[in-house]
UniProtKB/Swiss-Prot annotation:
Species in which this protein is naturally found: Herminiimonas arsenicoxydans
Keywords: Aminoacyl-tRNA synthetase, ATP-binding, Coiled coil, Cytoplasm, Ligase, Nucleotide-binding, Protein biosynthesis
Chief location category: cytoplasm
Binding positions (ATP): 562
NCBIfam families: PRK05729.1, valS
Organism classification: Bacteria, Pseudomonadati, Pseudomonadota, Betaproteobacteria, Burkholderiales
Gene Ontology biological process: valyl-tRNA aminoacylation
Entry remark concerning the domains of this protein: ValRS has two distinct active sites: one for aminoacylation and one for editing. The misactivated threonine is translocated from the active site to the editing site.
Ranges in a coiled coil: 812-839, 904-969
GO cellular component: cytosol
Protein name in the entry: Valine--tRNA ligase
Listed InterPro entries: aa-tRNA-synth_I_CS, aa-tRNA-synth_Ia, Anticodon_Ia_Val, M/V/L/I-tRNA-synth_anticd-bd, Rossmann-like_a/b/a_fold, tRNA-bd_arm, tRNAsynth_Ia_anticodon-bd, Val-tRNA_synth_C_sf
Length: 969
C-alpha cells in the first residue's frame, strides 16, 4: 500500500471504520482460556446528538477496549441508548407544539408511536456519531432500554421487588414539576439563590386574649419594654401556601411564646382554628421565631406534621392552581396570582405587618426551569433501608447497606478514592426512591387495579387476572398509567444486557464488568443504583472499578450548555465547520430566543474563521491528554491543533522510514541472528551492527512501554498521551531519525541494515503502542510498515487491532547506550547554543574543535563526531588535546570543552556585546522595578509575577555569559 504524501484523515477514517466492523473485529469472544474485559457504555439519551463530554468519555472507553483486545482478552464493550423518559417526551411534545398539537390531542397510543419514530431517527444519529469517533463496541450487542429484552427484565425486577416487600405504593410528599405534570427526583431539582420577599403576617389568637410581647432589651438581654398583643407574627416566603396551614410552630426554648403553646390561632382568610405547637425544628433567632406548618407543601413541615400527628391539607392542583380545599375566592387561581391576591387581602384586613426583600433558595426542575412544588401524591417507591427477606442474596440487609459494604470492602473501587466519600455520604442519608413518573413515555408500571382500587402487580395482564380471580374478583382491570423513572431501567443495565435471569455465557464472562467510566455527576443517579440492583438480583457487584472523570467545560471553565451557546459538537472538530454554520447551530432551538444575539456575538469573537478540520485521531489524542483523575477539564481547541501536528509528524516520520527502507535490505532474515552475528558498535562482525544510538532508542522504547502499561493500569490517559508524545516526537522523530540519517549515509552495510531494522521495528511498535488512542492513522501506517518490519500479513487482510500490544522487555534496557546518547544530546545542544551566542546564520557551516581530557575520552568524542557534524550543522569536527587561544566562546560538557572555530572581528564583537549587555541591563532594571512595586506584586496574577521573575533569571544568566565573553575579548 503506497503512503500518500500528506496525512488526510477523512478518507482513511471512512475506509477503516467500515472495514473494521465488516471484518467482525469488534465482536466479543467468550473463550474459556482467555481472561475477560468488559465495559458498559453509559447509554446516551436518545434525545439528540453526542456532545464533547461523550467524545471524552468514549475515547477513554475505546482506548481501554482496544488495549485489552490487543492483549488477548475476551473483550466486550456493550453499547446502548437510553429512552430518557422526561427528556424525550419534552422533545417530542415541543415538536407537536410547533404544529399546535398536544399529546392529549393524539392520545397515549398515537403519541408513543410518535416518540418511537423520533427514537429511530435520533438513535441512528448517535450511533453514527459514535462510529465517527472511532469507537469499537460490539454492535451486535447494542440495546435500547425500552427494547423487548430490557422491558422483560424491568418487569421481572419490579414484580420481584413487590413480592419481596421492597416496592410499595403510598401517598408521600414528592418533588412535583407542574409543567411536566410529574414527580421528579431530588437529583433532577436544581436549587439556586434568587431574590424574593419575606412577608410578616399576623395570626390572631382565636379566643381574643392578649399577652405581653417584649420589644426592647438591655445589654444583658433582659426585656425592658413590652407591648400588648392579641396575635403572633409569622414570617413566610410563600404566603399562598398559608391556605393549607395546620399549625404554627415555635422554638420550645423561646420564652416569648412558650406560654402560648397549646392555644389556638385563627388562620387568616380561612376562618380555621389551628394550634400553636413547640418543635425543635424552629430556630428562635430566625425571622419572628414563628413558623407556619403546611405538611402538604413543604418537606420540613411534613416531618413536623408526622411528629405532631397533624392533618395534611393540599391546596394545589397538579398544574399548580389553587384547589377546592381553599376558600372559594382563590380557587382556580395560579399559585403566583393567588399569592398576589392573598397579600392584598391580608393588607386590606390589617394583617400584613411587614414585607422585606429576602434572598432564598428556589428549587427548579432541571428540564423545564419551573419552580418545583412539594406535592402530596400517590407514588411507587423502592424501600432503600428495609431489610431484604429470606431467599434473596443478602437477607436481613437493605439494598443500601449492601451497596455501602461493597465499596467499603473494596469489591467496588472508586477512582479517585475521594469519590467514595461522596458515594457514602449520599447513601447514608438516602430516602426511599420514588420510581413512578406521571408520563406516557417509559416502562409502564406492571400494576392493574380492580373497580375498588385494589392493586395486582403482575408480569402481564393475564397474570394480573389470575391473581385477581384468586381473590374472588372477576371484573374489569385498569392498568396503572404511570411509567417508571428512567434511572430504574438504567440501574439494571449491568445484568439486563447479559441475558439475566438466565445464566448465559455472557453473564458468566462479563459480570462484573471490569470498569465503569463515568462523570461524577451521575454517581448518585446511576452508579450507586447499579450497585444496589445488581448485588440484590445477582449477588455480584456490577463492576470492579469506577473511573470517575471530570466534566468538560469551555476554555474559561464555564459549564457547556445549549442556553450558554458554548457547546461543541465533536463531529465539528473532526470535519471542521464555518463560523456561519456554527452560529446557526448554536442559535437554533433555544429555550429563550432572545439569547441568540449574544450567543452569535460571542461565537464570532471566539471562532472568527470557524473551526478547522482536525480529524478524529487529533481529537482523541486531545481527549486523552486531558484525562487525569477527577478534575474538571477546560477544553482548549488549540490543543487539537497541536495534536493534529503530532499526527502529521508521525505520518512524515513514517514516510522518511519508508523512503530509506523500501527496496533495501532491512536486516530481517528468516532465522534470528546467530551467536555473534548481531554486532554492537562493530565488536562482532556480521550481518547487522547495532550502534549505541540504535540500542538507546530500543532502551527508551522499553521505558515508554512500561510507563504506558502503568498509565492503563492507573486509568491515567493523560500520562499515556504524554509518554507517547514525548517518545514519538522528542526521542524518535527529533533525535533518532536524525541520527539514523547519519548512520545510513556513513555507516557500513551491517550498520545500515541495523539502522533500517531499528527504524522499522521501533516504528512498528510505536504504532501498536499508540493504536488505542489514535486508531485510524496507526492502522493506515501499520499496513505499510508491518510487512517491511518482518510481519507476515494475513492473505485475507490483517489489522493492527488484532496484533499483540507491546510489552516492555527489561533485557533490552541499556543504560550505557542511554548515557552515551545523553552526552551526544548535551554536546549537540552546546554547539547549537554556541551558534546562537555568536549569532551565526543557520546556513553557515563552521568547524568544531573539542578538547578531550584523556585518550579514552578522545575516542568517545570521536564517536560523536559524525553525528555532531550533521546535527549541529558543522563543516568538520576535530578532537584536540587543547583548544587554541581564541576570543570565541567555549562551552563545557562534562570534562570536554567545545569551541566553534570562527574568525572574529574583535572590535565589532566588543561593540555588539556592549550594546547587548546594556540592553539586558535595562531589561533587568525594568523587570526588577516591577517586582519591587508592592502594588504590582499584590494585584497582578501569580502567573504574571512568576513570568516576570523568570525573565529576570533568564536575562541575568545570559548577561553573565556575555560579560565573560566581553572579558575574553
Amino acid at each position: 500500500m503506497e503512503l500518500a504524501k500528506s496525512f488526510d484523515p477523512a478518507d482513511i477514517e471512512a475506509f477503516w471504520r467500515t472495514e473494521w466492523e465488516k471484518r467482525g473485529y469488534y465482536t466479543a469472544t467468550t473463550d474459556a482460556d482467555k481472561p475477560s474485559f468488559s465495559i458498559q457504555l453509559p447509554p446516551p439519551n436518545v434525545t439528540g446528538t453526542l456532545h464533547l463530554g461523550h467524545g471524552f468519555n468514549q475515547t477513554i472507553m475505546d482506548g481501554l477496549t482496544r488495549y485489552h483486545r490487543m492483549r488477548g482478552f475476551n473483550t466486550a464493550w456493550i453499547p446502548g441508548t437510553d429512552h430518557a423518559g422526561i427528556a424525550t417526551q419534552i422533545v417530542v411534545e415541543r415538536q407537536l407544539d410547533a404544529q399546535k398539537i398536544t399529546r392529549h390531542d393524539l392520545g397515549r397510543e398515537k403519541f408513543i408511536e410518535k416518540v418511537w419514530e423520533w427514537k429511530e431517527k435520533s438513535g441512528s444519529t448517535i450511533t453514527g456519531q459514535m462510529r465517527r469517533l472511532g469507537t469499537s463496541p460490539d454492535w451486535s450487542r447494542e440495546y435500547f432500554t425500552m427494547d423487548e429484552p430490557r422491558s422483560k427484565v424491568v418487569t421481572e425486577v419490579f414484580v420481584r421487588l413487590v413480592e419481596q416487600g421492597l416496592i410499595y405504593r403510598g401517598k408521600r410528599l414528592v418533588n412535583w414539576d407542574p409543567v411536566l405534570g410529574t414527580a421528579v427526583s431530588d437529583l433532577e431539582v436544581v436549587s439556586e439563590e434568587e431574590d424574593g420577599h419575606m412577608w410578616n403576617i399576623r395570626y390572631p389568637l382565636a379566643d381574643g386574649s392578649t399577652y405581653k410581647f417584649p420589644i426592647a432589651y438591655d445589654e444583658a438581654g433582659n426585656a425592658t419594654e413590652w407591648e400588648e398583643r392579641n396575635f403572633i407574627v409569622v414570617a413566610t416566603t410563600r404566603p399562598e401556601t398559608m391556605l393549607g396551614d395546620v399549625a404554627v410552630a415555635v422554638d420550645p426554648d423561646d420564652e416569648r411564646y412558650t406560654h402560648l403553646v397549646g392555644k389556638l390561632l385563627t388562620l387568616p382568610l380561612c376562618d380555621r382554628a389551628i394550634p400553636i405547637i413547640a418543635d425543635d425544628y424552629v430556630d428562635k433567632e430566625f425571622g419572628t421565631g414563628c413558623v407556619k406548618i403546611t405538611p402538604a407543601h413543604d418537606f420540613n413541615d411534613y416531618a413536623v406534621g408526622q411528629r405532631h400527628n397533624l392533618d395534611k391539607i393540599s391546596i394545589l392542583t397538579l398544574d399548580a392552581k389553587i384547589n377546592e380545599h381553599a376558600p372559594a375566592a382563590y380557587q382556580g387561581m395560579d399559585r403566583y396570582a393567588a399569592r398576589k391576591q392573598i397579600v392584598a387581602d391580608l393588607d386590606a384586613q390589617g394583617l400584613l405587618e411587614l414585607v422585606k426583600p429576602h434572598k432564598l433558595m428556589v428549587p427548579r426542575g432541571d428540564r423545564t426551569n419551573a419552580v418545583i412544588e412539594p406535592m402530596l401524591t400517590d407514588q411507587w417507591f423502592v424501600a432503600m433501608s428495609k431489610p431484604a427477606p429470606e431467599g434473596t442474596h443478602f437477607p436481613g440487609k437493605s439494598i443500601t447497606e449492601v451497596a455501602l459494604e461493597k465499596v467499603a470492602s473494596g469489591e467496588v473501587k472508586l477512582l479517585p478514592e475521594n469519590w467514595a466519600n461522596t458515594y457514602n455520604q449520599w447513601l447514608n442519608n438516602i430516602q426511599d426512591w420514588c420510581i413512578s413518573r406521571q408520563l406516557w413515555w417509559g416502562h409502564q408500571i406492571p400494576a392493574w387495579y380492580d373497580s375498588e382500587g385494589k392493586v395486582y402487580v403482575a408480569r402481564n395482564e393475564e397474570e394480573a387476572r389470575t391473581k385477581a380471580a384468586a381473590q374472588g374478583y372477576h371484573g374489569p382491570l385498569t392498568r396503572d398509567e404511570d411509567v417508571l423513572d428512567t434511572w430504574f431501567s438504567s440501574a439494571l443495565v449491568p445484568f439486563s444486557t447479559l441475558g439475566w435471569p438466565e445464566e448465559t455465557p455472557d453473564f458468566k464472562n462479563f459480570l462484573p464488568s471490569s470498569v465503569l467510566v463515568t462523570g461524577f455527576d451521575i454517581i448518585f443517579f446511576w452508579v450507586a443504583r447499579m450497585v444496589m440492583m445488581t448485588t440484590h438480583f445477582t449477588g455480584k457487584v456490577p463492576f470492579n472499578t469506577v473511573y470517575v472523570h471530570g466534566l468538560i467545560r469551555d476554555s474559561s471553565g464555564q459549564k457547556m450548555s445549549k442556553s450558554k451557546g458554548n457547546t461543541l459538537d465533536p463531529i465539528d472538530l473532526i470535519d471542521g465547520i464555518s463560523v456561519e454554520d456554527l452560529v446557526a447551530k448554536r442559535t437554533v432551538g433555544l429555550m429563550n430566543p432572545k439569547q441568540a444575539a449574544s450567543i452569535e456575538k460571542a461565537t464570532r469573537k471566539e471562532y472568527p474563521n470557524g473551526i478547522a478540520a482536525y480529524g478524529t485521531d487529533a481529537l482523541r489524542f486531545t481527549m486523552a491528554s486531558y484525562a487525569s483523575l477527577g478534575r474538571n477539564i477546560n477544553f482548549d481547541l488549540h490543543r487539537c491543533e497541536g495534536y493534529r501536528n503530532f499526527c502529521n509528524k508521525l505520518w512524515n516520520a513514517t514516510r522518511f522510514v519508508l523512503m530509506n527502507c523500501e527496496g533495501q535490505d532491512c536486516g530481517f532474515r528468516d532465522a534470528p541472528c546467530a551467536a555473534g552475528d548481531c554486532a554492537v558498535d562493530g565488536k562482532a562482525g556480521g550481518y547487522t551492527d547495532f550502534s549505541q544510538a540504535d540500542r538507546w532508542i530500543v532502551s527508551k522504547l522499553q521505558r515508554t512501554e512500561t510507563d504506558i502499561a502503568k498509565g492503563f493500569a492507573d486509568y491515567r490517559f493523560d500520562n499515556i498521551a504524554s509518554s507517547l508524545y514525548q517518545f514519538i516526537w522528542d526521542e524518535y522523530c527529533d533525535w533518532y531519525l536524525e541520527v539514523a540519517k547519519v548512520q545510513i549515509q556513513t555507516g557500513t552495510e551491517a550498520q545500515q541494515r541495523a539502522t533500517r531494522r531499528t527504524l522499522l521495528r521501533v516504528l512498528e511498535t510505536i504504532l501498536r503502542l499508540a493504536h488505542p488512542v489514535i486508531p485510524f492513522i496507526t492502522e493506515q501506517l501499520w499496513q505499510t510498515v508491518a510487512p517491511l518490519a518482518g510481519h507476515k500479513m494475513h492473505p485475507a487482510g490483517d489489522s493492527i487491532m488484532m496484533q499483540p500490544y507491546p510489552e516492555a522487555q527489561p533485557g533490552k534496557l541499556d543504560e550505557q547506550a542511554e548515557s552515551w546518547m545523553a552526552e551526544l544530546k548535551s554536546m549537540t545542544d552546546a554547539c547549537r547554543n554556541l551558534r546562537g551566542e555568536m549569532q551565526l546564520s543557520p546556513a553557515l557551516r563552521v568547524p568544531l574543535i573539542m578538547e578531550a581530557g584523556d585518550t579514552e575520552q578522545a575516542a568517545r568524542l570521536q564517536s560523536f563526531a559524525p553525528y555532531l557534524q550533521a546535527l549541529a550543522k558543522l563543516s568538520e569536527v576535530n578532537v584536540a588535546d587543547q583548544l587554541p587561544e581564541s576570543p570565541a566562546p567555549v562551552s563545557i560538557v562534562g570534562a570536554a570543552k567545545l569551541m566553534l572555530k570562527v574568525e572574529i572581528d574583535v572590535a565589532a564583537e566588543r561593540e555588539r556585546l556592549s550594546k547587548e549587555i546594556a540592553r539586558l541591563d535595562g531589561e533587568i532594571t525594568k523587570a526588577n522595578s516591577k517586582l519591587g512595586n508592592e502594588n504590582f506584586v499584590a494585584r497582578a496574577p501569580a502567573q504574571v509575577v512568576a513570568q516576570e521573575e523568570e525573565r529576570v533569571a533568564n536575562f541575568s544568566a545570559t548577561l553573565e555569559k556575555l560579560r565573560e565573553q566581553f572579558i575574553k575579548l
